[in-house]
Amino acid sequence: PTHEEQEYNFMVGNGINKLFERALPEGEKTEENVLRVRKEFIPYYDVHNADDSRPYPGISELLSYLQSEGIQLAVASNKYQAATEKLIAYYFPEIRFTAVFGQREGVNVKPDPAVVFDILKLADVEKEDVLYVGDSGVDMQTAANANVTACGITWGFRPRTELEKFNPAYIVDSAKEIEKLVSSTC
């Protein structure tokens, strides 16, 4: 079925299987249909995932700044692993990420904290040294589940009100605010 464009913002964020389940018509939300749609979607998305996407304003500069300050960077996404790696390599080739993790076989999707724990282990850092930045309630819940500091961003897919429900330590309106926040706490 077709959906209003703004509805898609609330379908994404929990992995592609959940996206397909939410998008399918009532009565057709079966695992079989989800897997059928997934099988058709992945080859297309593998080729076209960067067609209409762009980094948000200021993100490339923010990542470069953080890297220059010696801060370890990581990605924890609910996109499937291959798509996550491809998008990050395409948009941020100059950034050295400690980890780039998407949805992986045998690892629960966010808000399960497993992906954060995997990153902590790879980075060899303590929870109290982490700032988990995200644009959705799923991200804020992931940070809470991992017991790391959460920073919600208001320019993503979800409204500020969704972020506020999770009481993150910070909510920011621009990438520059993250830079100031990190500068003041380092």
Each language-model region and where it sits:
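Conserved phosphate-coupling serine/threonine residues in phosphotransfer and NTP-handling enzymes
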Residues: 77-79
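N-terminal helical cap/lid subdomain that shapes the substrate entry/recognition surface
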Residues: 1-61, 65-69, 82
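Asp-based, Mg2+/Mn2+-dependent phosphohydrolase catalytic module
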Residues: 6, 81, 85-186
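Structured helix-beta-strand junction loops
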Residues: 14, 69-70, 103, 166
